[in-house]
């Protein structure tokens, strides 16, 4: 998606350890025009798959997921990283490792919001090692829900995440695919 690639080039910063900082439009401040365009692109790609819900992880996956949900007219469910007094039992849970935070988190979704009747689209902000998406797939499996597709905002194609997700047989679509972050230069793969 050219618009997203332009935002990444103009406003993204490469940090040590192959970390891409996109706080200016996705991970801290949100650009709603870009989010709407991304949501529409995800909807266009997955519109014929019978999606009944979109599932993501708090917090940076929420904005693109909501705009995709709006475009597809379906609810969005986000996995919580921390339990609260209102989210304590009747949960589907998985443990995921965060590449950027270098820590594991238990993520949870209430059984009330995900069932075997659902056909879901997983949306995540980044694909690096694939652990977040795999955790959401595990939650869907616990619920008996069908995962029809995985939408990724930014994929670091030089890491193993895509390879792991491809092994699931579920269609994966990334809006921007990064080939390299070497020498603080952002190089993209061609669009899918």
UniProtKB/Swiss-Prot annotation:
Disulfide bonds: none annotated. Belongs to the purine/pyrimidine phosphoribosyltransferase family. Xpt subfamily. Homodimer. It comes from the Bacteria. Pfam families: Pribosyltran. Pathway: Purine metabolism; XMP biosynthesis via salvage pathway; XMP from xanthine: step 1/1. GO terms for biological process: purine ribonucleoside salvage; xanthine metabolic process; XMP salvage. Its EC number is 2.4.2.22. It is found in: Cytoplasm. One of its GO terms (molecular function) is xanthine phosphoribosyltransferase activity. This is Xanthine phosphoribosyltransferase. GO terms for cellular component: cytoplasm. Keywords: Cytoplasm, Glycosyltransferase, Purine salvage, Transferase. 5-phospho-alpha-D-ribose 1-diphosphate binds at residues 128-132. The keyword Cytoplasm applies. Its main location: cytoplasm.
């Amino acid at each position: 998606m050219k618009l997203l690639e332009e935002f990444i080039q103009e406003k993204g910063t490469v940090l040590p350890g192959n970390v891409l900082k996109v706080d200016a439009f996705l991970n801290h401040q949100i650009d709603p025009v870009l989010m709407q365009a991304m949501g529409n692109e995800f909807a266009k790609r997955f519109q014929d798959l019978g999606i009944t819900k979109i599932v993501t992880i708090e917090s940076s996956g929420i904005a693109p997921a909501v705009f995709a949900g709006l475009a597809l007219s379906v609810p969005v469910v986000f996995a919580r990283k921390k339990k609260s007094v209102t989210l304590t039992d009747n949960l589907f849970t998985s443990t995921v490792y965060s590449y950027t935070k270098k820590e594991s988190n238990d993520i949870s979704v209430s059984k009330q919001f995900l069932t075997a009747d659902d056909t879901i689209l997983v949306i995540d902000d980044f694909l690096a090692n694939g652990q977040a998406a795999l955790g959401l797939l595990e939650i869907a499996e616990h619920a008996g829900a069908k995962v029809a597709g995985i939408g990724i905002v930014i994929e670091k194609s030089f890491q193993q995440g895509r390879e792991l997700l491809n092994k699931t047989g579920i269609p994966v679509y990334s809006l921007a695919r990064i080939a390299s972050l070497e020498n603080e230069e952002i190089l993209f793969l061609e669009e899918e």
